Amino acid sequence: MAEGHTHPAAPMVDEVSDFEVLEMAVRELAIEKGLFSADDHRRWTEYVHTLGPLPAARLVAKAWLDAEFKKLAVRDGVKASLEVGVDWINGPPTGFGTPSDYCNLRVLEDTPTVKHVVVCTLCSCYPRPILGQSPEWYRTPNYRRRLVRWPRQVLAEFGLQLDPGVEIRVADSNQKTRYIVLPVRPDGTEGWSEDQLAEIVTRDCLIGVAVPKPGITANATRPVHPAVHPVHHEH
Amino acid sequence: MSKIEHDRTHHAAKATGIGDPQCFHGEAGPAKFKVGDEVRVRNLPDLFYTRCQVYTRGAVGRVTEVVYESPAAEDESWDNTDQPEWFYSVVFRQKELWPDYPDLYENDTLETEFSERWLEAP
Amino acid sequence: MSDMQMSNVIDGQAAARLDTAPISLLEKVRSEGRVWTDLAEEYGVTNPDPPWKITLEATCDLLAEAECALPALERRWEEDELSEERYAGVPFPERQLLALAHSMIRRGLVNEGELAKRMQQVHERLTQV
């Protein structure tokens, strides 16, 4: 540590892992073989770095505060996204959306009697331009196969239990539409600002496996266990 | 974008600034189904590649949105983008998809999209 | 339809074409490579992801877009298959990286020999003082 510094340098991994080397080697060979260009890769990397869940949280907060905006969000998710700084069409380096996200966001509005939850059984498609990178559990066959079949059980594992009379609607994004959930605004948030509201709309609320609660501003940590046996239990 | 021999240049020319699926707007002709229609998922033979989930085959649901026009995924994967179709969002009762889905949760549903070729009147 | 049938049909399409037999270079990386969770813990780094996770995502996007060399759906099916059959127990994103390299080798996009050679060069470059 250098003398005269009052703060230690941020810790860094001071070691080169074979995985880091493999990633770089694959990328360099792909570029040399013309599978894509170095320029394209740099632009894509920059773009992916800009993505995160905050715009989606703000979209929900805005919708809670403004009934007209909520109607727009439900009617035209791509247009509503522009108001939180996300351009599904021109944002990505292609100028026409990304090859896995496309440009058709639909905002699914929860009500007291309908709760939405999102999955992509085929390949774990996710609304990255407005929500960032998907969490590992979302990508696993365990989640993808089980949510469509046993949504109540999977949601219970996430700590979410709903009245049997509530309609749980699983949205399987198998084509070009990508979904985020617009949860019901919780009690105890009267008079809150947009910032305060956005803070409790976590990524898990936007996927639909959690509901927003005053005071809860982070996703629950989930241990991920590799599936030892494929899932086919009977209930 | 990099030089390509796959037809991404054509797609880029067509879709830049417009978006995908927006770039196919107006190409599919009249929609066969409308919101509220009951539809059954056809069990077409899968050649190689499909985005129509097997768990929906033969099930009857209700069109909830007519969402966009696009080449069917089965054509698009072979770069066959000449004949876009209408795509529909269809809602199914879970009980319809899984016969032993618990009766206690009879209101539960599932929503997913199909291109027109996959649907027929029940 | 049972879960087993469902998973077979989803995975069957790609699995029929993918050879999941081990590739010795990748088995070596898998057994000798240090995963991010271990490195982060050892060095006290709090970032949950390695710095190369995003560059890997960009590579996957571009393989699907630019030349359509490896379309997204097929890459993901192969990744599912390999995650279960070959690279089970490897943490994500190391698992995603191994699956990608495996898919690319099996499709002839890169070959094992040149990848091994390039890895050696990259390693030298990154570790030279």
What spans do the regions from the language model cover?
Chain A
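Terminal, compositionally biased segments used for targeting/anchoring and flexible tails
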Residues: 2-235
